[in-house]
Amino acid sequence: MVTSENRAPRGRNFLRKWARRPIRVMVSVGAALAAWQFAAPREANAETIEAALARAYENNPQLNAQRAIVRQTDESVPQALSGYRPMLTANASAGDQYTTEKEIFPPIPGTALTQGAAVKINGHTQPYSYGATASQTLFNGNQTGNKVRAAESQVSAARETLRVMEESVLLAAATIYMDMSRDAANLEVQRNNVRVLDRTLTDTNNRFAAGQVTDTDVAQSEAQLAAGQASLHAAEAQLAITQANYRRIVGVDPANLAPASSVERFAPSTLNSAIAMGTAQNPSVTAAEYGVDVALLQVKIAEGALYPTLTAQASVQQQYGANIVTPKLFTDSATVNLTVPLYQGGGEYASIRANKEAVGQQQINVDQVRDQARANVVEAWAQLQAAKAQIEAAQRQNAAAERALNGVRNEAQVGQRTTQDVLIAEQALVNARQSLIVAQHDRVVSSYSLLSAVGRLSAQDLALPVKVYEPSVHYQQVRDAWVGVRTPSGQ
């Protein structure tokens, strides 16, 4: 603690300097906040929120992994289509064969073989053969057609799930961008606050040396400065945490972030229209609806097991050295097979019942997801309206806190206010600055949340400077592929 021995009075010069200080303090803190205002002009080399969202859209590992899942799901369609196509097989065999044959001849009257005869024949052959078989399913209870439609619905559901992930990543990127701006602005406010409190302590020491205040006033100033320093350290730690999360989500370290603005212009203008859009277009809802389609088709696929199966088969076979008597043999065949299931243990009936229950579960899930989407819209809408009102209130709070601090400082010079009053007024101004920073942060974040809730938070809707990923490109590349093990990307 500073003692009275090293406190030098400043007399009239000190009093004149004290009277002028509130203006400089307010300008310093106000300028720091103004530099962060969302309406401030952007620097030429500043990183914009659109650029950050574009980086996350291209590089986020969760989003890229979900795209790979969609490509994997695309392959279920050609797998299902394979049921329409013929199956071709080729076979070949070769071996070494030793045979012993005993031929018995019946008696022939009037010849030397009146008693009959038995002849033993030993043989050695090396038989080999080759052939081919083609089969085609003609009817299987429409299981193939339903499998194709189910696979197509699964692809559609996977695409909607990709939209869910895209919205999640873009919302996370927008939120961390605003968190970074908020925490950087808060750190600057805390730094200015410490500088102000440090000067306040110096002035209080000088007034104490002049006999104008007591040691209690000095202790109050010291306590407030220590509290300000603690808040500064906490703000520094929070900024470091936010920087790490920014890199995790966006893919690069944050640097020179430009001010951001609300995107509510892309959202519906009324709550009712937002609810209608969210319950119809939110990708979580549409993905659940495709889930119902898949479940219904699974019922039809299971019912197909009760129908007859009709297949056609053709084969050719060439054999050499099958035996001594027939050194060469060629066979060909064409058959049509009809299989009618009569009773298969009851498993197919259980499968049908289970799939019908799955339909009910999926329908309930749609209702649940739609209710959640509605709640998300209402929540985001309320948060956006609250943030807009909070900005107006915080702006009035800042103006009033500035006037109050000016008045308290001036009144303190004539003994009408104590040091504690000055410290309280300074803290009130800091709180007002923080309230405005948080309100501006919340308005931007809640506007992105509203877009996500109504299903409009996408790179295409935001017109981000990035090439939009189009899942249909890969789908068309593999849908009708009959052969080939390499993926369209070359893997």
Model-derived segments and spans:
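Periplasmic alpha-helical coiled-coil/stalk elements that build and connect Gram-negative outer-membrane
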Residues: 2-7, 12-13, 17, 166-279, ...
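Acidic, low-complexity, intrinsically disordered peripheral segments
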Residues: 3-11, 96-98, 438-491
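Sec-dependent N-terminal signal peptides
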Residues: 17-32
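C-terminal segment of classical bacterial N-terminal signal peptides
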Residues: 32-43
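Bacterial Sec-pathway N-terminal export signals of envelope proteins
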Residues: 42-93, 99-100, 137, 254-293, ...
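Small/polar-residue-enriched beta-strand and adjacent coil segments characteristic
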Residues: 48, 87-165, 286-369, 376, ...
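Amphipathic alpha-helical coiled-coil segments
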Residues: 65-80, 165, 169-189, 199, ...
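Solvent-exposed polar/charged
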Residues: 82, 248-251, 304-305
